[in-house]
Amino acid sequence: MTHTISGQYGRDTIVLETGSWAKQAHGAVVYKSGNLVLLATVCAADEAKEGQDFFPLTCEYTEKLYSVGRFPGGYFKREAKPPEHEILISRIIDRPIRPLFPEGYFCEVQLQVQVLSADGDVSVAGHALNAASAALAVSDIPFNGPIAGARIGRVNGELILNPTTKEILNSDLDLVVAGTKTHIVMIEGEAKELSNEEMIAALRFAQKHIAEFVTLQEEYAKKIGVVKREVKLKVRDEELLSKVKEYAFAKLTTANQTPDKTARNKEISNVNKEVVEFFKDTIEDSDKIKDIKAYLHELEYEIVREQVLTKGTRFDGRKLDEIRSISVEINPLPGPHGSAVFTRGQTQSLGVVTLGTGSDNQRYETLEGQKEKSFMLHYNFPAFSVGEVRRSSGPGRREIGHGNLAERALKLVLPKPDEFPYVIRVVSEILESNGSSSMASVCSGSLALMAAGVPIQGSVSGIAMGLFSDSSGKYAVLSDIAGLEDHFGDMDCKIAGTRKGITAFQMDLKVTGVSFDVLESVFEQAQRGRFHILDIMEKHISKASSTLAGTAPRIIVRNIPKDRIGELIGPGGKNVRGISELTGAELYIEDDGKVTISGSNQESAEKAAKMVDGFFAEVEVGKIYEGKVKRIADFGAFVEILPGKEGLCHISKIDFKRVNSVKDIVKEGDIIRVKVLNVDKTGKIDLSRKDALEEEQV
């Protein structure tokens, strides 16, 4: 039986339909908004796999190019490996949904959202999250939702729910928010240096609309008569837990006072081994031994949180708002165009900048068509950074997500292309990690950009904030969280920005929501921390280097008429190749007539720029030009004075004396100076070497 419901979501009319498509899925919703059609499906295993001790959730967002009537690019003409933007939306779906499944629910769940029909004016991120939540709402899978997603823009100071793609281009805010009826559970986005107050106002605006769509989903589930399946959750053995606590609590408390990550992990591991060995003599059940390991983790959770909430101190002795020690190195690497090392506690990022030309743009395909980006930040998290051994298999979802967040933090302070016409690549190599490596990447990237001579608008710092709370409403906000505090805390909120305001942000929760009072505290405390970090960074470098690295390309930009691009390129690219061969420079010509000229040195670039100018320069009568003899006839020499523009120097005007043969004075390939005597109506150019010599002698 088909069930349909519709409702307003801001300016959009949303239609939800179930029971007609994908009926064997445990939950399936066709989600419509304008011409946008999404299919969201969810399936869950009946039972958890034997020995499963974590929740295996997979969220996949896929864009079908048939949704806009296009073939996929490439040889195979079918969708294959998901591109980065699909991975990022998959993460937006995953992160707010994951903590809302029941504790102890370990059945495998697969959630998929597919774009079947696209609308060029509709941004998909918020809608994809809504479709995913709706599929869970109509399924029998246990889920403490529903939730809703909202993409928020701000144009001319006015907040907009689910802005169009055109509105986003003019927006100083691009925010994706997920929430329940009463609380925010996830935020992510970028801003053009907005204040804390402006950010909170945007979140309040989002929450109001989120509540509307949550209500619509609740009505829909009630209309369908959804009954959730009964599942066996992992039941705690209170007697065994009590025995483990009695034996291990004091030992774990002592081990947790060790500030060094490596030493602490070793001590915790030793305690865990000791406890397991102690109980092995009395417990033969292997599942019970696994339970003991889980209970030890629970005790550690309790110890760390109790210390923060009752004593106001942290495992490493820091105050709640205290930042770890920071050190900075500028240009430690001689070869790259710019580099910096940013170390905060036991987290260390090496930021490296490479400057390139238009041909280095990253090209990618979206539903809107082929796109290019001239700034990219790549984040690498090798196993050695946390002292582990594992196979290297390229960037995963986490690396892509962290890199994107750091990229968004920095891209809004970059100079405009006409001020600094370089393609810029930043790579963050995480050399060691103990929490907040993405924000360390922001700091090292900002420092490296300045070291490379990129005139950014201001230094950017980033900080990760944590939250510990209890059922009574008591909470503590932590600045610059370490890995342990991220693991055992309720929140991981990353905020980056300049002294003027916020440029990027991301918040994930492990609880079912956070109040606006808490959020205001987080943003205010984060600002103090960011400014402290900026103070240290700016002691080392506070403005861009005045010179580029010797190995960086030199770029000159010219703008030519669009209808004359073909003249510059020449038949089969002859003219462009000729310029490159003569100067050693490379030319990158865009459809709008922008010509980027890059040379290995300034002389090479300037020589090529002069030749480009020559193609579009008008011949001036009375001006002396330096030209190349292209061919010789009995009656004179043809001289190229500008690219593609030849004139005739008659034999009578080659020299002061009588000339019997042109070849007696000039030969093909000679560079000579000639004066333009006349340009007739047909464009024929009359040249004189004799007049040029005479004028220069005077």
Swiss-Prot record:
GO annotation, biological process: mRNA catabolic process; RNA catabolic process; RNA processing
Ranges for domain KH: 553-612
Catalysed reaction equations from the record: RNA(n+1) + phosphate = RNA(n) + a ribonucleoside 5'-diphosphate
Cofactor: Mg(2+)
Keywords: Cytoplasm, Magnesium, Metal-binding, Nucleotidyltransferase, RNA-binding, Transferase
Domain S1 motif, residue spans: 622-690
Principal location listed in the UniProt entry: cytoplasm
PROSITE patterns the record matches: KH_TYPE_1 (PS50084), S1 (PS50126)
NCBIfam families attached to this UniProt entry: polynuc_phos (TIGR03591), PRK11824.1 (NF008805)
Function, as annotated: Involved in mRNA degradation. Catalyzes the phosphorolysis of single-stranded polyribonucleotides processively in the 3'- to 5'-direction.
Protein name, entry field: Polyribonucleotide nucleotidyltransferase
